[in-house]
Every structure is written in structure tokens, then in C-alpha cells.
Amino acid sequence: MHCPFCSENDTKVIDSRLVADGHQVRRRRQCLACSERFTTFESAELVMPKVIKSNGNREPFNEDKMVGGVQRALEKRPVSADAIELAISTIKSQLRATGEREVPSEMIGNLVMGQLKELDKVAYIRFASVYRSFEDIREFGEEIAKLED
């Protein structure tokens, strides 16, 4: 690792600790040339799969788009920000766990519905009605009946 003070290549690690619930390593380093100390953080590069849209187009995973859909469904519902963050994190972990480089958008929608079903049934119905393009009240009733089973 290059020293940020003198740009020398030789540095040594003085101390290493896990931080961010074990998702990062904090390293205290010292330059062997100028003796300055500095801190680095190391974390895994987590690459999200590309999304295959229903029309066949491929695009990068857009977390903001997913979060927006979840937040719209949960608008004015009694669900904490922490619970929402955990649901988003769970969905992203499930997507990475597939090991696939590309996933269909339908899979993402189903994962979102699964999390919403656990968080809040009303939000689930809201999301499902848009995602599945409900045409009439009968479709709402059928989906609600499935929830009651």
C-alpha cells in the first residue's frame, strides 16, 4: 500500500480490527520510510447482477428504483425505517446469493413482494396491484384471499 504522505510503497500493518458488524476490516498502518501512520478500510466488492427487463433489455441493478417502489408501497404505514433497511438489505443479499450475473426483473419483484408480505400486508397488496397490473376489484379480492389462507 502506498503511503499517502510520501508515496513510498513499503508500509506495515500495526493493527487490524473488524468493524461495521464484521463487514469491514480497519487497518492501522505505518510507513517504513517516513514513519507516518494512517488508517485504511477494507471491504468486499459486492457486485449486483444486471437486470433483464421484460422486454429483453438489460440494465444495471438500480437500488434507488427498488427502494422507491418499496417506500411508495409502505407510505403512511406503521413500519420503521430500520425494518425497511433490513428488507432492502435482505433482497440485495438474496440477489447476490443467486450467483447469477443477470436476473430477470420478475425475480426482483417477487423478492420485494416476499419482504413486503412479511412487513405489512397492506403494503404488499399495494405493491402487488401495481406490479401485477390488477385490472379490477376481483383481482384485489383474490390476492387478499390468498393472504388470509
From Swiss-Prot:
<keyword id="KW-0678">Repressor</keyword>
<protein>
    <recommendedName>
        <fullName>Transcriptional repressor NrdR</fullName>
    </recommendedName>
</protein>
<feature type="domain" description="ATP-cone">
    <location>
        <begin position="49"/>
        <end position="139"/>
    </location>
</feature>
<keyword id="KW-0863">Zinc-finger</keyword>
<feature type="zinc finger region">
    <location>
        <begin position="3"/>
        <end position="34"/>
    </location>
</feature>
<dbReference type="InterPro" id="IPR005144">
    <property type="entry name" value="ATP-cone_dom"/>
</dbReference>
<keyword id="KW-0479">Metal-binding</keyword>
<dbReference type="Pfam" id="PF03477">
    <property type="entry name" value="ATP-cone"/>
</dbReference>
<keyword id="KW-0805">Transcription regulation</keyword>
<comment type="similarity">
    <text>Belongs to the NrdR family.</text>
</comment>
<dbReference type="InterPro" id="IPR055173">
    <property type="entry name" value="NrdR-like_N"/>
</dbReference>
<dbReference type="GO" id="GO:0003677">
    <property type="term" value="F:DNA binding"/>
</dbReference>
<keyword id="KW-0238">DNA-binding</keyword>
<keyword id="KW-0067">ATP-binding</keyword>
<dbReference type="GO" id="GO:0045892">
    <property type="term" value="P:negative regulation of DNA-templated transcription"/>
</dbReference>
<comment type="function">
    <text>Negatively regulates transcription of bacterial ribonucleotide reductase nrd genes and operons by binding to NrdR-boxes.</text>
</comment>
<keyword id="KW-0804">Transcription</keyword>
<dbReference type="Pfam" id="PF22811">
    <property type="entry name" value="Zn_ribbon_NrdR"/>
</dbReference>
<dbReference type="GO" id="GO:0005524">
    <property type="term" value="F:ATP binding"/>
</dbReference>
<keyword id="KW-0547">Nucleotide-binding</keyword>
<dbReference type="InterPro" id="IPR003796">
    <property type="entry name" value="RNR_NrdR-like"/>
</dbReference>
<keyword id="KW-0862">Zinc</keyword>
<dbReference type="GO" id="GO:0008270">
    <property type="term" value="F:zinc ion binding"/>
</dbReference>
